[in-house]
Amino acid sequence: MVLVSSKKLYYNPLNISFLPILTVSPMQIVFSPEKVARVLLWIVAFLTIANTLGQISHHFFGHSRLFGMVYLFNLNREWSVPSFYASFAVLFCSLLLTLIAWVHHRREEVDFKYWYGMAVIFLLLAIDEYTDIHNRIFEPVRSYLKAIGLISYAWLLVYVPLLLVIALIYRRFLARLPKPTIKLFVLAGVVYLVGAIGINLIGDQYTYQERDALSYSVFYTLEELCEMLGIIMFIYALLKYMEGYIGRLALVFLDREK
């Protein structure tokens, strides 16, 4: 089983000489941008509904466990089904970015470094999605800002400068991308940041001391939903870019030549 493009260029990207010669069978799974996005949207819908039902059970009926199901599908918990999905989705972005970078590198195009850079960024984001490292690192910052009355500005003070630096580094690269790709990238980024910074900012302002309140559940559900939708849009944008400028991605099942 190998990853190839729709141009049907079957090769050994690792250049390992002892691999047997392979012939192509008709079995393949094509990563259509529309179909991938549709599947991911159904998954996100299921996770959001499961989380919402769990919070209704907790806040309105006093059942906060339900055999561990409330925690298992909580969008705001580590080591839960939603955190596993979110980490996988971001990791998939990193994989797609790596494949795009590798192709551009093979073509000796200068922008491959930017694609590799994004792949590394999304790999780190995938690790953070599952482990929630950023909250542990920045908790002292949040505590200090709370003490001086600036808790509602915690995310702005930490993340906006970082985003500005990344935007400054990538501005020329983004300008060279096809216009449809730019639009999709911007839309995905806006939706993601509305959740990661916007809703998070509002949630910190109103619910910092009320982590068990219903309002906090509403805020983090909206936050995580925006982040997941933003990632789906980004995956769709990457697959559309690959489809138009590299080739449609597919998993092809190959038979050994007899």
Where do the model's predicted regions map?
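Membrane-proximal helix-loop-helix units in multi-pass membrane proteins
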Residues: 126-167
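Membrane-interface loop-to-helix entry segments
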Residues: 79-90, 149-165, 222-228
